[in-house]
Amino acid sequence: MHKALALVAFTALAFPLILIGQTSNVALPQDKGPNKIDVSTYPAAQQQGYKVFTEKCAKCHTIARPINTSMTKEEWERYVKRMMHKPNSGISDSQGKTIFEFVAYDQANRKDKNPSAFFKSLSDEEIEKLKAAQH
């Protein structure tokens, strides 16, 4: 009973704080959110960035995951670099730069205007606990 309560408490606290880029076999709350956004009002470079973003990022996880996650510019830079170095990501340096520029623009122009609608990132340790709880 105590273990179950601890798990419920952890889940409730962790729910709004999510990290993208984990393996696709881990279900995260933001995976259930919208899986696309309307970028028709974004500058042409960002519309092209969205295409690269959806093509490359969908190889390893849902597109909903990064669309529904909110991070600082520095966190986005770190996580895009991290994803670039994952085996079989197929993300070149120029594509990584394009993806980063898109997610940074999207963060500033969509997410930062409504921060309570998006999930924050978790630490690696918190993600491991979440993975363990799902198995």
Please tell me what each predicted stretch does.
Residues 54-64, 99, 103:
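The canonical Cys-X-X-Cys-His
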Residues 8-18:
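Bacterial N-terminal signal peptides
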Residues 42-58, 77:
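Sequence/structural segment immediately N-terminal to covalent heme-attachment motifs in c-type
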Residues 1-6:
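Positively charged n-region of N-terminal signal peptides that target proteins for export
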Residues 68-80, 85-91, 96-99:
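Amphipathic, hydrophobic secondary-structure cores in small proteins
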Residues 19-25:
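Signal peptide processing junction and immediate N-terminal pro/mature segment
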Residues 25-44, 94-135:
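Flexible coil segments in periplasmic/lumen-exposed cytochrome c-class electron-transfer proteins
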Residues 65-69, 89, 106-113:
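Inter-heme linker and motif-flanking segments adjacent to c-type heme-binding CXXCH motifs
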